[in-house]
Design a protein with these regions (language model features):
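Core catalytic lobe of class I
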Residues: 1-200
Length: 200
């Protein structure tokens, strides 16, 4: 990222290691909290540097550091949080002493709170008023998805449905056709597609 020109990028999506001890080939994912946050601050500084003034930054992160990341991006780097989205997925983490985890946090951050790209018409979904009630007062163009995203398995691969407060996209499992290589945390194309359509 250091080789990119300052102010040259419209949209950045980052899915960094969550610092939960995952076995990566080239990265130690069990740093002390202070070291992890310092490392994070260094690469976010580069993200902010390369973003255009009206640029958008999306960050995917787990529970462990979600709050710290939001504060860091707002207070240290002056970004504005437009949305804090919850991505709900299948194939969650099986836990023994707490509820199973089946979500991640997606922060939609912008440099300028008044000038940024948000293509609402590109991500509209049918409303309950349209689908459930057949109400003629419903906007024929649908509505914006809520801040929790759902893509149900029965809707794959042709489309998606956003239910209240949840973005649901299944994680990319080993048998999925879109699976590339052996990376255990590959993001689904449809989730990234929604972000790209909305923000570029």
């Amino acid at each position: 990222m250091q080789s990119l020109a300052t102010g040259s990028v419209d949209l950045v999506f980052a899915d960094p290691p969550f610092n939960i001890g995952y076995d990566y080939d080239v990265y130690q994912d069990n740093l002390e909290a202070d070291d992890y946050l310092k490392w994070t601050s260094r690469w976010i500084e580069q993200v902010v540097r390369v973003l255009k003034d009206d640029g958008t930054f999306w960050l995917a992160i787990g529970d462990e550091y979600a709050a710290e990341m939001k504060v860091l991006m707002q207070q240290e780097f002056g970004l504005t949080c437009r949305s804090w989205v919850i991505w709900y997925y299948t194939f969650g983490v099986n836990c023994k002493r707490k509820f199973n985890r089946s979500h991640a946090h997606l922060f939609h951050m912008v440099k300028d709170s008044k000038q940024f790209t948000f293509n609402a018409s590109e991500i509209r979904v049918p409303s309950a008023r349209q689908l459930v009630y057949g109400d003629k007062r419903a906007n024929p163009n649908g509505r914006l998805p809520d801040d929790t995203w759902i893509l149900r398995p029965q809707d794959l691969p042709t489309g998606f449905t956003a239910d209240d407060d949840t973005w649901y996209f299944p994680r990319v499992a080993g048998t999925f056709k879109e699976r590339l290589g052996v990376h255990g945390c590959q993001m689904p194309e449809q989730l990234l597609g929604r972000i790209i359509r909305a923000s570029s």
